[in-house]
């Protein structure tokens, strides 16, 4: 095509993801196209399993485990409260988490059990810094959810997942499935508790660090469930956990690729190829040791979608940030210091810098290039920001937050790189070196301005008096602070754009006060100035200020040139 671009063109739609999420939430509230129902404390939560699976690793495992998962459309769970599940569902569909002093503990516990890293991190930080302090927030207030209630809920969640993961065709007795009836023998539960306790102790002691929890091959290479589980004390339910327990949430990896009918959609037995689904699971398997432990309080996700985290975090970030700013105005200095740490934490977390610690390395390889060109919309001014991690920095322009403080002079900055440059004033560091004269500078722009001393470049010119300047701020000061009287300077440079003023006849000489026309199309710089200055210098020293205006440091800088052409700083 003549005059066109040959090749694909990527056209981003920044509002597309939020529009899709809004549409799904509207369907949920109206009960449209919901393919699964979650029962908690007698309440029904119709929802879309794809949305829950994208937000929660636990629901993803639950909805893609078992041979009859396509026919399972009702799940009754008792290890989370209805109020906590309501808040988490609203978070999944609206990207906004609503917490209060009364429910922050329940939401934290539910987020840990359901493996929602973003929510668990934020709630844990709120409790740790006592931003939402309560008299009694339950066992969730203990470090890493180590309370007895959380341990019981963790056990129940694990049993429920194992019940659906186990293949009902392996001829196991009904007592092997604790969730098939609440009357399971105590011996099985004791063995379960011992296995969990051993795994927890191994993680706490650091014995699991570096082990290959997933074996030498991907999940697709492992035998299906039931091929050799009959010899265990709890067949098909609890494999060996002392050495093979994965650190990411104490949940085992998938033991087999999904069946051909296991497509995760209600009421549809798809005929997809097993190889494609096995390859998808193989890509979703985390690298050994990349996922932090469930009880460590870190995120438990194994294959979290980093791009979705950025999209979900914007409104939550703004809500928490504005709350912290409001509290900072009424608190003392120490409290404001703590609030600064909270703000810093949120900005770093939602900027994407945390993903190297939360998500395994495999999820970054294919997303780094995409994230570098990501578009995000500011929730305040709706300006589209290009570049991953730049949205939190832009939001600071609205909130006035300056999270980075100099520990010497207490000056605060909005960006960490600005603080790093500021610290050079205290340390005396001057990393930028002139290759011609050896002068050192603390700032890159100072070196750039200094190099104009050697090159003679003065790119900034006053349109009224034709005076030229090395730096733009000097020209601005000349126009605003000093005031330009419009009289051409005796030592001003030649006009770089306008040429001879239009009121001067062609062929006539330059009017008094204006410099002569350039010779051979070249402008005069330091050499001509030195000759003029030597004639006018009262002491005959031959030294001049290359600023172009005697005693006006705004027209040049600290550089000085001698009559012999040697420059010094």
Swiss-Prot record:
**What are the residue ranges of zinc fingers typed C2H2-type?**
376-398, 404-426, 432-454, 460-484
Entry's SUPFAM superfamilies?
Answer: beta-beta-alpha zinc fingers (SSF57667), POZ domain (SSF54695)
Q: Where is this cross-link: Glycyl lysine isopeptide (Lys-Gly) (interchain with G-Cter in SUMO2)?
A: 430, 527
Question: What are the Phosphoserine sites (modified residues) in this protein?
Answer: 331, 335, 537
Secretion signal span: none
Where mainly found?
nucleus
Record PTM: Sumoylated. Undergoes sumoylation with SUMO1 that may regulate its transcriptional activity.
| Biased segments, Low complexity type | 279-288, 498-519
Where's the BTB domain? Answer: 34-101
**Which stretches does the entry tag as region Mediates interaction with SMAD4?**
371-569
Q: Which InterPro entries match?
A: BTB/POZ_dom, SKP1/BTB/POZ_sf, Znf_C2H2_sf, Znf_C2H2_type, ZnFinger_BTB_dom_contain
Q: How does it assemble?
A: Homodimer. Interacts with BCL6. Interacts with RELA; involved in the control by RELA of the accessibility of target gene promoters. Interacts with AR (via NR LBD domain); the interaction is direct and androgen-dependent. Interacts with NCOR1. Interacts with NCOR2. Interacts with SMAD4; the interaction is direct and stimulated by TGFB1. Interacts with HDAC1. Interacts with SP1; ZBTB7A prevents the binding to GC-rich motifs in promoters and represses the transcriptional activity of SP1. Interacts with the DNA-dependent protein kinase complex/DNA-PKc.
Name of the protein this chain belongs to: Zinc finger and BTB domain-containing protein 7A
Q: Which organism is it from?
A: Mus musculus (Mouse)
Q: Which gene encodes it?
A: Zbtb7a
């Amino acid at each position: 095509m003549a005059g066109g671009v040959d090749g694909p063109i990527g056209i981003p739609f920044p509002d597309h993801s939020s529009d899709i999420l809004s549409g799904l939430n509207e369907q949920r509230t109206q009960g449209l196209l919901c393919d699964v129902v979650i029962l908690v404390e007698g309440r029904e939560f119709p929802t879309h399993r794809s949305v829950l699976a994208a937000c929660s690793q636990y629901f993803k495992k639950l909805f893609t485990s078992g041979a009859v998962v396509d026919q399972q459309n009702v799940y009754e769970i008792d290890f989370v409260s209805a109020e906590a599940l309501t808040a988490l569902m609203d978070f999944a569909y609206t990207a906004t988490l609503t917490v209060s002093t009364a429910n922050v503990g329940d939401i934290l516990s539910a987020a840990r059990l359901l493996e929602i890293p973003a929510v668990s991190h934020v709630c844990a930080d709120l409790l740790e810094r006592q931003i939402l302090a309560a008299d009694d927030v339950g066992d969730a207030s203990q470090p890493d959810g180590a309370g007895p209630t959380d341990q019981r809920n963790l056990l129940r969640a694990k049993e429920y997942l194992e019940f659906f993961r186990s293949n009902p065709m392996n001829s196991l007795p009904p007592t092997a499935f604790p969730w098939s009836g609440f009357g399971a023998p105590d011996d099985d539960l004791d063995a379960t508790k011992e296995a969990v306790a051993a795994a927890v102790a191994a993680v706490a002691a650091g014995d699991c660090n570096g082990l290959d929890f997933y074996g030498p091959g991907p999940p697709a290479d492992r035998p299906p469930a039931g091929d050799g589980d009959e010899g265990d004390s709890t067949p098909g339910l609890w494999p060996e956990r002392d050495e093979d327990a994965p650190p990411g949430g104490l949940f085992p990896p998938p033991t087999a690729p999904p069946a051909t009918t296991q497509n995760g959609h209600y009421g549809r037995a798809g005929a997809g190829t097993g190889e494609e689904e096995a390859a998808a699971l193989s890509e979703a398997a985390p690298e050994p040791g990349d996922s932090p432990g469930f009880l460590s309080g870190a995120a438990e996700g194994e294959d979290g979608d980093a791009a979705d985290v950025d999209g979900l975090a914007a409104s939550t970030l703004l809500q928490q940030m504005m709350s912290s700013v409001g509290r900072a105005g009424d608190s003392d200095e120490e409290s404001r210091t703590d609030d600064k740490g909270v703000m810093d934490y949120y900005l770093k977390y939602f900027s994407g810098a945390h993903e190297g610690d939360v998500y395994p390395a495999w999820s970054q390889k294919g997303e780094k290039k995409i994230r570098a060109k990501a578009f995000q919309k500011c929730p305040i001014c709706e300006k589209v920001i290009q570049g991953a991690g730049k949205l939190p920095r832009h939001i600071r322009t609205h909130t006035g937050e300056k999270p980075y403080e100099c520990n010497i002079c207490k000056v605060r900055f909005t960006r960490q790189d600005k603080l790093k440059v500021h610290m050079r004033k205290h340390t005396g560091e001057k990393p930028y070196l002139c290759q011609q004269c050896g002068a050192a500078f603390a700032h890159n722009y100072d070196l750039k301005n200094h190099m104009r001393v050697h090159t003679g470049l003065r790119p900034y010119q006053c349109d009224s008096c034709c005076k030229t300047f090395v730096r733009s701020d000097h020209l601005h000061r000349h126009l605003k602070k000093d005031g330009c009287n419009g009289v051409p300077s005796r030592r001003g440079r030649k006009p770089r754009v306008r040429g001879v003023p239009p009121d001067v006849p062609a062929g006539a000489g330059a009017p008094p006060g204006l410099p002569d026309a350039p010779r051979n199309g070249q402008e005069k710089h330091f050499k001509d100035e030195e000759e003029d200055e030597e004639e006018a210098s009262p002491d005959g020293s031959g030294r001049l200020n290359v600023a172009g205006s005697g005693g006006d440091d705004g027209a040049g800088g600290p550089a000085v040139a001698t009559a012999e052409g040697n420059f010094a700083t």
